C-alpha cells in the first residue's frame, strides 16, 4: 500500500507505517496543484495530511482510497467530494487533547493576569504595575470549563 504524507509528520509515525509494510512517500511541501500531481504520479492509495487542504482536484487526480487527517476535524478535506468518489476520510481525534488542555489553562492564566493588555501597554512604553497587579489568581477557586 502506498502512503503519501503531504505535511510534516513524526518520524516515528513514518517508521511505524514502514514496519507494517507500507511504501511511504513523504513530501511536507505539497500544496494545491503539486499535491494533485504527486497523488497522480505516486499512485498513492492513502493520503495523510495535517493542515494541507485537500480539494476536489486533488481527490480526482489519482486512485486514493483513504484520506487521513493527522489531527482532529475534517476542515481541510473536501469530504463531500471524497464521498462522491468512494474515498474514505478519517481523522485522529483526541491526539492533541493534552496540548489543547495545556493551552486552555495558559489562556485562563493570561486572562486572569491580563497579560495581553499588559504587553500592549509595555510596547507603548507604559508600566502600569498597579493596574496589572490585580490578578485574582486561581488558588482556592472553583473553575468551570464549558466545551462545545
Regions found by a protein language model. Name each.
Residues 1-90:
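An N-terminal-biased, well-structured beta-alpha scaffold segment characteristic
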Residues 85, 93-142:
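Phosphate-binding beta-alpha-beta segment of Rossmann-like dinucleotide-binding domains, i.e.
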Residues 148:
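Glycine-rich Rossmann-fold phosphate-binding loop(s) that bind the pyrophosphate
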